[in-house]
């Protein structure tokens, strides 16, 4: 299917860390299945940029985020976005935490160290966040964070003191 399509980017979201699959995702989907899809897309079309996204604030640990990014990168994914999960309604999963912007900046750095060609990491980032700028970065342009973004990829934020996460209590 991908062989004949004039795509530049194939995007498929892993959504959450593997441990939370059964809580967050539809039972027909999984982190492992998403990895296979992303790997397969890259095998069929090595020229195709691949992108995925992770939501945070669902109960994962910082270490699990780093591990998930490493797993995604290992299958050849080129671009990644990380953003805060926001509970759409009371019927949806509650928010577990709101990581401080400094933690998003740390994840941005980890993703770059892992070799992602483009990264957007921040509380307001969504899976298609500034897709054009992310594409330009992946093609060798300026990192998204140097474009004057507000609240998006926040690796430019330097926080005095230690980074913390605010735990959220839901009624």
Identify the role of each PLM range:
Residues 18-22, 60-63:
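Short acidic/glycine-rich loop or secondary-structure boundary segments that cap or lie
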């Amino acid at each position: 299917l991908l062989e004949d399509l004039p795509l530049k980017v194939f995007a498929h979201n892993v959504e959450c860390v593997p441990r939370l699959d059964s809580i967050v995702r539809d039972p027909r989907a999984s982190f492992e299945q998403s990895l296979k899809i992303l790997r397969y897309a890259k095998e069929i079309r090595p020229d195709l940029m691949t992108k995925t996204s992770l939501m945070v604030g669902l109960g994962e640990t910082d270490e699990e985020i780093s591990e998930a990014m490493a797993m995604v990168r290992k299958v050849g994914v080129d671009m990644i976005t990380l953003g805060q999960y926001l509970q759409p309604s009371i019927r949806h999963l509650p928010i577990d935490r709101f990581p401080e912007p400094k933690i998003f900046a740390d994840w941005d750095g980890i993703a770059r160290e892992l070799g992602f060609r483009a990264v957007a990491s921040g509380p307001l980032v969504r899976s298609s966040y500034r897709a054009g700028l992310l594409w330009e970065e992946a093609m060798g342009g300026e990192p998204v964070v140097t474009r004057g973004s507000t609240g998006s990829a926040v690796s430019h934020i330097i926080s005095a003191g230690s980074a913390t996460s605010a735990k959220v209590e839901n009624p």
